[in-house]
């Protein structure tokens, strides 16, 4: 009986560690890279603080609302044709500007017709060359995509969750500094949209800042989370990553198995021994990770630090795909749902992409089997994470086996084109010397420079020789005249 109890304890511990959905990192550039000593210190401070249960809530939306997300995409590129007829093209320079509510509303209603799954086509710059001249071309177009968001009722008023912020539906617009969101007012169901937890985590409050919560087994940190006022019977919270959860008292432990109480002293001692062994194992793994802090992603004090390039990251868990998900750029990007909000996931880096750019024709639909293959590639590409992302097992893809995702509708949006020209000499000799120009254009630029330089030296030498001979003849004639 004692053996059965012990086996059940260990099995439960392992099953709780693997969570639902894919986990990714959301990162910002930083110069703040912890030292190995600071990392070692965090290993001993991991489990200090009050224990608390975090229940991750599923997005069972009785009411969903179609939201348009807009931003101006500005692309600049220079095209140079040298005096040797070589053509040089610079790298694309892409910047972003916020769109106004009026601009976004126009695209939302006129182009996307208030429907989900709409995305604007990215415009490209058409090359244009002039001899001995550099031309700078710029294309600016309004990028819009529509997605569904969670809507809920609170005190008789509808709210929509956008990037972890509860916005009144009656406002019909929101700007987070980068993107502009617009939507139409819709009637809201009175049913609580968050009733059934996806999973329960055993977590710890920070010993110094009780408002920060860390979940070691999942590698999740809940920092600067806020209350969401809803009609739900229990208090709901959301963090900056859009994760929706509730807090409660711990009735289990998913990191160290304190799940069975027994009057048998031997069983209690065995459980205590297992706990100590697991603590030692976690400590050893933590210290080993610290030694690799300059070479791979490392978890320190609630954040992940990626050394190449230096970035400070937060873990976003419970990402999954559904019938609204698509892939982009040959499967490199996946349009997924993370904590109730839509994000682009870069499967090569394991991070979210705030301003993703799909190549022309690069957006495609995907089946469940295809996505599982993409997911396997994700795990292979992100082996550098080591053991820190232990919640990246996907247990259920919402698609059925033979179901295919709807292909996103591509629309053309408002655009502006302009051309600015640098100083140069413009000589239209193309039509006259077209065959010779085409021949020269096929030669490497460096070879042409050398050839033209040698030719210039030869011509210069000939001119000097002619001048020398001319001067000598003139002097000879002067001498004859004097005689």
UniProtKB/Swiss-Prot annotation:
PTM description: Glycosylatedby host. Glycosylation is crucial for glycoprotein export at the cell surface.
Keywords: Glycoprotein, Host-virus interaction, Membrane, Signal, Transmembrane, Transmembrane helix, Viral attachment to host cell, Viral envelope protein, Virion, Virus entry into host cell
One GO cellular component term: viral envelope
Spans within the Virion surface topological domain: 22-442
Signal peptide boundaries: 1-21
Stretches assigned to the Intravirion side: 464-483
Main location: virion
Membrane topology term: Single-pass type I membrane protein
Transmembrane stretches, start-end: 443-463
Record's subunit section: Homotrimer. Interacts with matrix protein.
Purpose: Attaches the virus to host cellular receptor, inducing endocytosis of the virion. In the endosome, the acidic pH induces conformational changes in the glycoprotein trimer, which trigger fusion between virus and cell membrane.
Protein name (database record): Glycoprotein
Organism: Northern cereal mosaic virus (NCMV)
Lineage, opening ranks: Viruses, Riboviria, Orthornavirae, Negarnaviricota, Haploviricotina
């Amino acid at each position: 009986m004692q053996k059965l109890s012990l086996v059940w304890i260990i099995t439960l511990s392992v099953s709780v560690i693997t969570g639902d959905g894919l986990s990714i990192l959301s990162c910002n550039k930083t110069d703040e890279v912890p030292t190995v000593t600071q990392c070692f210190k965090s290993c001993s401070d991991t489990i200090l603080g009050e224990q608390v249960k975090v229940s991750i809530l599923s997005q069972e939306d009785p009411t969903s609302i179609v939201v348009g997300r807009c931003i101006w995409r500005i692309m600049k590129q220079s095209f140079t044709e040298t005096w040797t007829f070589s053509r040089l093209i610079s790298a694309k320079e892409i910047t972003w500007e916020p769109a106004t509510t009026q601009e976004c509303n126009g695209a939302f209603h006129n182009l996307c017709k208030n429907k989900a799954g709409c995305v604007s086509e990215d415009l490209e710059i058409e090359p244009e060359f002039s001899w001995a001249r550099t031309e700078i071309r710029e294309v600016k177009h309004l990028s819009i995509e529509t997605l569904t968001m969670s809507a809920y009722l609170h005190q008789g008023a509808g709210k929509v969750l956008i990037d972890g912020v509860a916005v009144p539906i009656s406002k019909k617009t929101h700007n987070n500094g980068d993107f502009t969101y617009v939507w139409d007012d819709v009637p809201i169901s009175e049913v609580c949209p968050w009733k059934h937890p996806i999973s329960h985590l055993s977590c710890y409050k920070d010993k110094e800042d009780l408002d920060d919560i860390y979940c070691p087994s999942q590698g999740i940190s809940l920092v600067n989370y806020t209350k969401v006022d809803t009609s739900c019977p229990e208090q709901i919270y959301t963090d900056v990553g859009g994760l929706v959860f509730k807090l409660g008292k711990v009735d289990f432990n998913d990191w160290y198995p304190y799940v069975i109480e027994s009057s048998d002293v031997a069983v209690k001692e065995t459980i205590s021994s297992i706990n100590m062994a697991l603590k030692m194992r976690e400590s050893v793994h933590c210290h080993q990770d610290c030694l690799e802090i300059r070479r791979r992603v490392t978890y320190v004090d609630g954040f992940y630090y990626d050394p190449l390039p230096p970035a400070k990251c937060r873990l976003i868990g419970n990402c999954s795909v559904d019938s609204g998900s698509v892939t982009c750029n040959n499967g490199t990007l996946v349009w997924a749902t993370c904590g109730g909000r839509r994000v682009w996931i870069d499967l090569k880096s394991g991070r979210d992409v705030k301003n993703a750019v799909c190549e022309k024709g690069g957006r495609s639909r995907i089946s469940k089997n295809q996505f599982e293959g993409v997911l396997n590639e994700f795990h292979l590409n992100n082996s550098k994470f080591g053991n820190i992302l232990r919640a990246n097992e996907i247990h259920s893809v919402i698609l059925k086996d033979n179901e295919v995702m709807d292909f996103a509708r591509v629309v053309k949006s408002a655009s502006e084109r302009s051309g600015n020209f640098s100083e140069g000499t413009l000589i239209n000799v193309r039509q006259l010397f077209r065959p010779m120009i085409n021949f020269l254009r096929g030669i490497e630029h460096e070879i042409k420079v050398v050839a033209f330089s040698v030719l210039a030296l030869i011509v210069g030498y000939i001119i000097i020789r002619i001048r020398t001979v001319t001067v000598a003849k003139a002097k000879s004639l002067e001498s004859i005249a004097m005689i």
